[in-house]
Every structure is written in structure tokens, then in C-alpha cells.
Design a protein with these regions (language model features):
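C-terminal accessory region of SF2 helicases/translocases
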Residues: 205-206, 217-303
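Inter-lobe coupling/hinge segments of SF2-like helicase ATPases
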Residues: 1-222, 281-282, 287, 303
């Protein structure tokens, strides 16, 4: 777990560091994990890379392998952004599906300041009336570990038809019989988190669905309707939010280069190839050598 990153923990002879769910770690945390030992090999895994990670693969700092095939028999999850005006119709459609359902809310309890953002506790009470013929369960992070496990066990066993929950189900939940994911306040989540939540369904041969409710659906959220690949979503996120600071710790934001553009995807491989060709010849190219030896920040950022 994250305990590996403790400064008091001394580890020697670490040759390989594997980071799963990479998007859940910060830049400093990932650097601390990979610093254990003498420059260990690092393998990071994620279904939805953050913009900075995509940029690092583009700039050649990370080698990339893509797993593009779905498990046999699986179907892509159909995703719809649902306007508030269609909420009642969406509920009626859900009632007819005869399947298990996740309903994810951003908050556990109602907020005094963000009154329009739905909470799991209040939605549980409302939905129990709307879906009066269904059995509902409630899951959130404030429950005791034993109680959380009991709720998940009952949902997996089919004792609950609908699980009202917070994003606590984002990882580690595998319930193939659940085929509908409803996400309230989709604008409150990042693309990576939305894609991870969507991945809780579509785990059987049955068609699965993801319904995204948002008061102001953005292009970022609408992209989920047509894009099923986590990597393609991450590329969209890179274009929309920027790559952050390659030399620093910011994981998004548009870098302010003098000339180059971070999203010149087709040009970057050619630049890499040219840099690799010229680097061994620096002693023969004194002007270029002087540039390379200068502080890179002064070269790439405008005054």
C-alpha cells in the first residue's frame, strides 16, 4: 500500500517497482516509490492514464504497452449523458431492465454549501420511494469495515437490486450481474474516475449501460458517450486540460512553451529521433552543446 512510501522504511536492493492503479498516486508518491533502490525498473498500470502520463509517453520518458482486447464475450458499455429533463423517463427505463444497478453519488451527506450535489444518504431515502418494489442497499466510507463488506456481500448475492453508493466502488468490485451504472453529478468527477466507475459494469456477456447525470454536461463528459478506450479518453483529457509540468509535479494544465506545443503528437517522435542522433555528437557541435548544458527551464519557457 502507500505505506511503502514512508521515509522511515528502509528498503535495499529493489530492482523492480510495480505501481497498480497509477492514476491514484501523485507525482511525488510515484517518484518516491520508484526511488527505492538503485534506479529500479518501473512498471505502472492504469486503465485511464492522467494527462501528464500521456505526455511522458509522448516525450519518450515512458515506454507504452496497450491492452486493447476485451475479455471474451464482453460487450462495450453503452454510455448516455442524461439531462435533468429526462430523469423520470430514465428511472422508468431502469425499472423495466430487471437487473442490478449501481447509483453513485459524489457525497455521503448533503453539503450546506453545495446544495445541488446529490449525497448517497439522501438519495437512498428518495430512491427507496421511487423504486418501492426493489431492495436497496447503502454503501459509503463512513461505514465500519464489517458493515461495508456485508453490504457488498448482499449485493453480490442478489439480496439488493440497487446499491446506492459513493465512489468507494471505483476499484476492487466485481459483480457481473450488475449491468447498469448511474452516476450523479458526473461533472464532479474526473474522466479517469468516471471511466473506472463505468468499468464496474460490463463484466458479463449481457449488455451494460452507464447513465451520466450532470446539470451542465461538458464536452469532456460527452466524450464518454462515444469513447470506450481509457487511453483515448486520456488523450482527450490531455488536449482539454493540458499535460501539467513535465519537470515539476502538476498533473494537468497547459505548459507555456516558447515554441513547441505539447499536443504536436505527430512531430514529437521526429524530434526524439533527431535528439538521439545529435546527442552523441555534442562535442562536434559547440553551439548546441552550450544550449543543452543550460538550464532547460530558461530555454523552453518564455520570460
Amino acid at each position: 500500500t502507500h505505506a511503502l512510501l514512508s521515509q522511515t522504511l528502509q528498503l535495499n536492493k529493489v530492482g523492480l517497482v510495480i505501481i497498480d492503479e497509477q492514476h491514484r498516486f501523485g507525482v511525488v508518491q510515484r517518484a518516491a516509490a520508484s526511488a527505492r533502490g538503485q534506479s529500479p525498473h518501473v512498471l505502472t498500470m492504469t486503465a485511464t492514464p492522467i494527462p501528464r502520463t500521456i505526455a511522458l509517453t509522448l516525450y519518450g520518458d515512458l515506454d507504452l504497452s496497450l491492452l486493447t482486447d476485451m475479455p471474451p464475450g464482453r460487450l462495450p458499455v453503452k454510455t448516455w449523458v442524461v439531462p435533468e429533463s429526462k430523469r423520470a423517463a430514465a428511472y422508468e427505463w431502469i425499472k423495466k431492465q430487471q437487473t442490478q444497478i449501481f447509483i453513485v453519488c459524489p457525497f455521503i451527506e448533503e453539503s450546506e454549501t453545495l446544495t445541488s450535489v446529490k449525497s448517497a444518504k439522501s438519495e437512498y431515502a428518495k430512491l427507496a420511494k421511487i423504486f418501492s418494489e426493489s431492495n436497496l442497499g447503502l454503501l459509503h466510507g463512513k461505514l465500519k469495515t464489517k458493515d461495508k463488506q456485508q453490504v457488498i456481500t448482499k449485493f453480490r448475492a442478489g439480496e439488493y437490486d440497487i446499491l446506492v453508493t459513493t465512489p468507494i466502488v471505483e476499484v476492487g468490485i466485481d459483480i457481473p450481474s450488475a449491468t447498469i451504472m448511474v452516476i450523479e453529478g458526473a461533472d464532479r468527477f474526473g474522466l479517469a474516475q468516471l471511466h473506472q466507475l463505468r468499468g464496474r459494469v460490463g463484466r458479463s456477456s449481457s449488455q451494460s449501460y452507464c447513465l451520466l447525470f450532470s446539470p451542465t454536461p461538458s464536452d469532456r463528459i460527452k466524450a464518454l458517450e462515444t469513447v470506450t478506450s481509457g487511453f483515448e479518453l486520456a488523450e482527450n483529457d490531455l488536449k482539454l486540460r493540458g499535460a501539467g509540468n513535465i519537470y515539476g509535479t502538476s498533473q494537468h494544465g497547459v505548459p507555456n512553451f516558447k515554441i513547441a506545443r505539447y499536443d504536436d503528437f505527430s512531430l514529437i517522435p521526429h524530434v526524439q529521433k533527431e535528439a538521439q542522433r545529435l546527442l552523441p555528437k555534442l562535442n562536434e557541435l559547440p553551439l548546441l552543446r552550450d544550449l543543452v548544458e543550460k538550464d532547460k527551464i530558461d530555454l523552453i519557457q518564455p520570460n
